[in-house]
């Protein structure tokens, strides 16, 4: 289990062994017994090179006691002496989501909320899909700059949003073709759960490229 020094959530850390007999009964009890650090709903892991990324669906990066946060992605550097830091969070390197106000007509803001599933992109970027309504797909470039020196990479961008509000994008991954991203859609408001392939379309004749989306399986 991961244990961050000094009872903090970020910084120097260590891996501590668990009582495997207790793990078979309750992994949470086993982790608590060795003082492992608690995070809010770690939903998915993705390793890129020597960094392990973790989607924390309800993490609050500013208030460790809050279990209803907007979510975040953290990175664990897998060195002999591991370190932990947050790399994606609303209000840091992504907008805070604001729902549109029907009464006033005020427009909403598409923000980052409920990080849920992760994928390693072909160029080393981290792809993130939300458990949110509406569910969005974001792309984080871990190697991008940090202009305000807050520890969060500046290269965090919105890639796509589902129009089906109840639906949840999940199971995001790249196949053998580095230009094709697969996204599973569940809990669709239309009852049409599906797997979608988002592919770069090469137009030729110097007309550039565009993204196309195809449902490769559904019901």
Where are these regions (language model features)?
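Sequence/structural signature of beta-propeller domains
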Residues: 1-219
């Amino acid at each position: 289990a991961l244990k961050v020094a000094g009872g903090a959530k970020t910084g120097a850390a260590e891996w501590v062994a668990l009582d495997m007999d207790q793990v078979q009964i309750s992994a949470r009890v086993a982790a608590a017994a060795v003082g492992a650090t608690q995070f809010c709903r770690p939903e998915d892991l993705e390793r890129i090179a020597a960094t392990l990324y973790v989607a924390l669906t309800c993490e609050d990066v500013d208030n460790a006691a809050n279990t209803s946060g907007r979510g975040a992605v953290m990175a664990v550097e897998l060195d002999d002496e591991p370190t932990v830091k947050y790399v994606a969070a609303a209000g840091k390197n992504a907008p805070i989501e604001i729902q549109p106000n029907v009464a006033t007509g005020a427009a909403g803001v598409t923000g980052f909320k409920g990080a849920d599933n992760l994928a390693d992109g072909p160029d080393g970027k981290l792809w993130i899909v939300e458990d949110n309504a509406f569910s969005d797909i974001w792309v984080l470039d871990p190697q991008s700059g940090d202009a305000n020196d807050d520890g969060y990479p500046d290269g965090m961008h919105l890639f796509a949003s589902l129009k089906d509000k109840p639906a949840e994008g999940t199971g995001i991954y790249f196949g053998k073709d580095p230009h094709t991203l697969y996204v599973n859609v569940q809990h669709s408001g239309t009852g049409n759960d599906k797997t979608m392939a988002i592919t770069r379309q090469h137009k030729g004749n110097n007309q550039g490229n565009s993204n196309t989306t195809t449902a490769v399986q559904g019901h």
